[in-house]
A protein has these predicted regions:
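Glycine-rich/acidic phosphate-handling loop/turn and adjacent ATP-lid/helix
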Residues: 156-186
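Conserved DHp (HisKA) dimerization/phosphotransfer helix of two-component histidine kinases, i.e.
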Residues: 38, 54-103
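Short alpha-helical Gxxx[C/S/T] motif in the catalytic ATP-binding
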Residues: 188, 192
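A short, conserved loop immediately preceding a beta-strand within the C-terminal catalytic
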Residues: 111-116, 120
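Histidine phosphotransfer helical core of two-component systems
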Residues: 2-9, 13-20, 28-68
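Detector for a conserved hydrophobic position within an alpha-helical segment of the HATPase_c
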Residues: 196-197
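A residue-level detector for a conserved hydrophobic packing site
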Residues: 122-123, 129
Length: 218
């Protein structure tokens, strides 16, 4: 068993390493964005020079890859930094959920679903869960998740809201999709879970595209 002082030193080292890693990722993201600008300029020159279609297609794929990499690094930097919530009392969770569902059917039991939430961040988290971490909503032919919102009452902890998704197109993973960090989708789900927990809530996956989130209400 390690002495307490050694354990504290190890913890401090990990914190410092985490901060340094976030800064390195941030710098790499800026470099990728710079490369994307150069590649975009090059594509414009190639278009004016009427270069062959296969060359233009190649440079287009390069730009798209640089953009995906920069976006993933942005998500990683956000996840690694402290979460700052701008809470607003009496924020309507039902409204946020309907907007985040992007046309998917949302079933509610009625009643009030107001809480002390950061509307922008919570809406982002709900949208990312509904999409299964994808950067855009699933195509119409793929179908979407079914969403249900219910209110729970407890004598000790007070009222809470339970959001249940069925049919979420979560990325393939052997473990918890909120801890996989697998590509952009995994990072978005991990950030969504962090936002939910930052509001005092819980998030867990039941498998088979079933996800549940519980959030405290006023």
């Amino acid at each position: 068993m390690k002495p307490l002082k050694t354990e504290l030193q190890d913890a401090e080292t990990l914190i410092e390493l985490g901060s340094a890693s976030v800064q390195v990722v941030h710098d790499l993201k800026n470099q990728l964005n710079g490369l994307k600008l150069y590649a975009t300029f090059l594509r414009t020159r190639m278009e004016k020079a009427e270069r062959p279609a296969d060359e233009l297609e190649t440079i287009g794929k390069l730009i798209a890859g640089l953009e995906r990499g920069a976006n993933d690094m942005t998500l990683l930097v956000r996840y690694g930094r402290p979460l700052e919530l701008s809470r607003r009392p009496s924020t309507d969770l039902a409204r946020l959920l309907r907007e985040a569902a992007e046309g998917a059917h949302v079933e509610t039991d009625g009643g009030a679903y107001e809480g002390d939430f950061d509307p922008a961040l919570l809406a982002e988290a709900l949208k990312n869960i509904t999409r299964g971490g994808r950067a855009s909503a699933p195509a119409v032919e793929e179908g979407g998740a079914e969403v249900r919102l219910t209110r729970e009452e407890a004598d000790v902890s007070g009222a809470s809201a339970l959001v249940e998704w069925r049919g979420v197109p979560v990325p393939d993973t052997d473990g918890d999709p909120f801890r996989s960090f697998n590509g952009g989708a995994g990072l978005r789900l991990a950030l969504a879970a962090r936002i939910i927990r930052g509001h005092g809530g819980e998030v867990y996956s039941e498998g088979g595209g079933v996800i549940r989130v519980r959030l405290p209400l006023q």
